[in-house]
């Protein structure tokens, strides 16, 4: 286990011949258990080879009480595909006032299950179900300073 950032635990997934990364129900169960035990109520598996990869892909388990401090990414796009559960992506202005909210769901056909944004808006994720499991993709390489934490949060 190694750290992806100062707040998330990174669990290295099994890799198989040919550079394939496989992740199944057993892995999902283990990741969910890790999120339940983690003091920040989330855990991730990074499926990219390293922080220099041009595409950064992660499978993330969030518990309902997980707090994601509002932040923004400099010069990066970001997308979420909800695999299980429900969440909202909440956007804020420079003063911390909510400006938009996008509800995502893996099971409610009236809500989208996918979100992609290229704006450098302040945002956070609010878990609406007992837990949520997402596939997140962002542009690399990963640089810790590319993510700015909101000073008002």
Where are these regions (language model features)?
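Double-stranded beta-helix
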Residues: 99-103, 108-110, 122-153
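Short strand-connecting beta-turns/loops that link adjacent beta-strands
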Residues: 52-53, 75, 130
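Short beta-strand His + acidic residue motifs that chelate non-heme Fe in jelly-roll/DSBH
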Residues: 69-71, 89-91, 115-117, 123-128, ...
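Glycine- and acidic-residue-biased ligand/ion/polar-headgroup-sensing regions
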Residues: 64, 75-95
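Cyclic nucleotide-binding regulatory domains
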Residues: 87-115
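Conserved hydrophobic/aromatic beta-strand scaffold that supports enzyme active sites
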Residues: 59-61, 79, 114-116, 136
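A short, N-terminal "cap"/entry segment at the start of jelly-roll beta-barrel domains
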Residues: 1-55, 100-107
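Conserved short histidine dyad/triad with adjacent acidic residue
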Residues: 59-76, 119
